[in-house]
A protein has these predicted regions:
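Conserved HGGG/HGGXW glycine-rich cap/lid loop of the alpha/beta-hydrolase fold
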Residues: 17-61
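N-terminal cap/lid segment of alpha/beta-hydrolase-fold proteins
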Residues: 1-13
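Alpha/beta-hydrolase-fold serine-hydrolase catalytic core, especially in secreted/extracellular enzymes
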Residues: 279-290
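A generic "binding-loop/recognition-motif" signal
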Residues: 12, 21-22, 256
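Short, flexible hinge/linker loops that cap or flank conserved catalytic cores
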Residues: 8-10, 19-20, 45, 215-217
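Flexible "cap/lid" subdomain of the alpha/beta-hydrolase fold that forms the substrate-access gate
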Residues: 12-14, 31, 52, 59-89, ...
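Short, flexible helix/strand-to-coil boundary loops that buttress conserved ligand/catalytic motifs
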Residues: 20, 39-42, 63, 130, ...
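Catalytic histidine-centered segment of alpha/beta-hydrolase-like enzymes
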Residues: 256-269
Length: 290
């Protein structure tokens, strides 16, 4: 796993990677992954942005208290504290999977901190947990996450099979990539319990409640959506476009799956470069809700 830095916050020591210079861009992953998801895109973007990829609580190298609130509300509050700790007044935010739900909460409640917003396939409004995630939810409810984790640690092909549904080409995932995702999740019984608590805390009610705030959110917003995702259909990309006040458009990536930011970084990076240039032209530094 790429070497981590740490930001000390009231939520714990939040791990992150940082590359590049310029205005800050904050990249937020989802469940079962970590900031490594964004490495290929950051390779292409570090020349124009200070690219910061955070590890959510219960993921990657982030360290939190055993009683820490790991809900999406808690994660959104952590992002604000994380930005404060790094002295980031405004950020270009990019999200994926459950990170997309978390970022909607963060942006809706803190519009003045958002220079621009880019949302990719993920949890939206009341569409989660999606039916395709039911096996994960059942495993957490039945206390089976430790067993699942140990199988993945012992057999990387089992791990590949677990992640396969999110990738167009899971056969291309290297052993190092799989280890970088799996090992931090199940490195200890304590961390595995955190992962289980994160899953059990998944609840769409807060995201439903912030819809009025999203409608007033005027930060320039781009939606980039893979059409081959079995978790989150393209209709949710259109919902975001039609709901967020500053939303511009939807870019559809044919056949792309949930974790396309890792598999198709050229397309994502090109979309981000254009969107960031647009945001600069319209004075996104002053974007805030009405």
């Amino acid at each position: 796993m790429e070497k981590r830095l740490y930001a000390s916050t009231p939520f714990g020591d939040i791990a992150y990677t940082e590359r590049g210079s310029g205005p800050a861009a904050l990249f937020v992953h989802g469940v079962f992954l970590n900031g490594n998801l964004w490495r290929p895109a950051i390779d292409r973007l570090s020349g124009v942005r200070r690219c910061i990829a955070v590890d959510l609580m219960a993921h990657g190298a982030t360290r939190t208290r055993p009683d820490q609130d790991l809900s999406f509300d808690g994660q959104a509050a952590m992002l604000l504290a994380f930005c404060d700790a790094l002295g980031l007044d405004q950020v270009d935010v990019v999200s994926n999977d459950s990170g997309t739900a978390i970022v909607q909460l963060f942006a809706a409640r803190n519009p003045g901190r958002i220079r621009s917003l880019t949302l990719t396939n993920g949890d939206v409004h009341d569409n989660f947990p999606p039916p395709a995630a039911e096996p994960m939810m059942v495993a957490a409810k039945q206390g089976l996450i430790p067993e699942v984790g140990q199988r993945m640690l012992a057999d990387l092909e089992d791990a590949r099979a677990q992640f396969a549904v999110g990738y167009e080409h899971p056969e291309r995932l290297s052993a190092d990539t799989l280890r970088a995702y799996v090992e931090p999740l199940f490195s200890s019984p304590e961390r595995t319990k955190e992962v289980e608590r994160f899953i059990l805390a998944i609840d769409c009610r807060s995201n439903v409640a912030v819809e009025p705030l999203l409608r007033r959110l005027m930060a320039p917003t781009l939606v980039v959506w893979g059409t081959g995702d079995i978790f989150f259909g393209i209709e949710w990309a259109h919902w975001l476009r039609d709901t967020i006040g500053g939303a511009r458009r939807v870019i559809e990536l044919p056949d792309a799956k949930l974790f396309f930011p890792e598999e198709r970084p050229d397309e994502l990076a090109a979309a981000l470069r254009e969107h960031w240039q647009y945001a600069e032209c319209v004075g996104a530094g002053t974007a805030a809700s009405a």
